[in-house]
Amino acid sequence: MNPESRVIRKVLALQNDEKIFSGERRVLIAFSGGVDSVVLTDVLLKLKNYFSLKEVALAHFNHMLRESAERDEEFCKEFAKERNMKIFVGKEDVRAFAKENRMSLEEAGRFLRYKFLKEILESEGFDCIATAHHLNDLLETSLLFFTRGTGLDGLIGFLPKEEVIRRPLYYVKRSEIEEYAKFKGLRWVEDETNYEVSIPRNRIRHRVIPELKRINENLEDTFLKMVKVLRAEREFLEEEAQKLYKEVKKGNCLDVKKLKEKPLALQRRVIRKFIGEKDYEKVELVRSLLEKGGEVNLGKGKVLKRKERWLCFSPEV
């Protein structure tokens, strides 16, 4: 099987499994000009009729972080022109924004990029945003969460379909994307910061994953199977937690007696829903009130008090 057929086959398999496109007509591609987004664009143009898409357009966000940023922007404009595609370009000083808002460059860049994409989505009437996240991105994300401490959600990473975001390359490996691009003779730009191992994600990409692949050369495929198992188990837990939440929640209170009878995994999920927080320490602080009296201050005006068999927000919020 040639590289193009391999990638197309995996994209179609994902569509069969997840129905990532189900009625969407106008798709906006988050386009950096890198090999991933170039291949994604080529694939969606090829499958445009198959997915019944009316329009596929590009959106490029210039982070103004690198000297080559202007070069990348010009490449993206030329790429769109060659294919007679509409392109929207945004630009913002990410470094200045990060400093003003006490955010990392990565956090600030992501925030501004998605803000721009969603503004275009809404103002221009697109149905969804397609991003070029692939299987290796998923693996890196999962490993990053693992190093910081996480539960099922972190290990699962991102999903192929989340709100307005679509990730058609979810099943595709980075190596398969690169082989596709070379096979088709596609041009792209390189982001030199992808090789800076001072960045945690890059360190995982260039140092950790190669070592893991020495243990299991089919690491990505094995990981994807694990993610599918974890997603099914999370779905079951979420369904059970939702049932329990409806059973134990009365207004701004939880029924402690009923909640204490349930497994720890469900207790935590119900508490997370109730307080609107995923932070492990905060969830455990609240859970401690199931065993004793007292109160917990979660900040932002959220105070929880144990009142006999009830755990309630006080004052009510």
Swiss-Prot record:
InterPro entries: Rossmann-like_a/b/a_fold (IPR014729), TilS-like_C (IPR054377), TilS/TtcA_N (IPR011063), tRNA_Ile_lys_synt (IPR012094), tRNA_Ile_lys_synt_N (IPR012795). It catalyses: cytidine(34) in tRNA(Ile2) + L-lysine + ATP = lysidine(34) in tRNA(Ile2) + AMP + diphosphate + H(+). GO terms for molecular function: ATP binding; tRNA(Ile)-lysidine synthase activity. The keyword Cytoplasm applies. Keywords: ATP-binding, Cytoplasm, Ligase, Nucleotide-binding, tRNA processing. GO terms for biological process: tRNA modification. Gene3D superfamilies: 1.20.59.20, HUPs. It is an enzyme of class 6 (ligase). The N-terminal region contains the highly conserved SGGXDS motif, predicted to be a P-loop motif involved in ATP binding. HAMAP family: tRNA_Ile_lys_synt. Belongs to the tRNA(Ile)-lysidine synthase family. This is tRNA(Ile)-lysidine synthase. The gene is tilS.
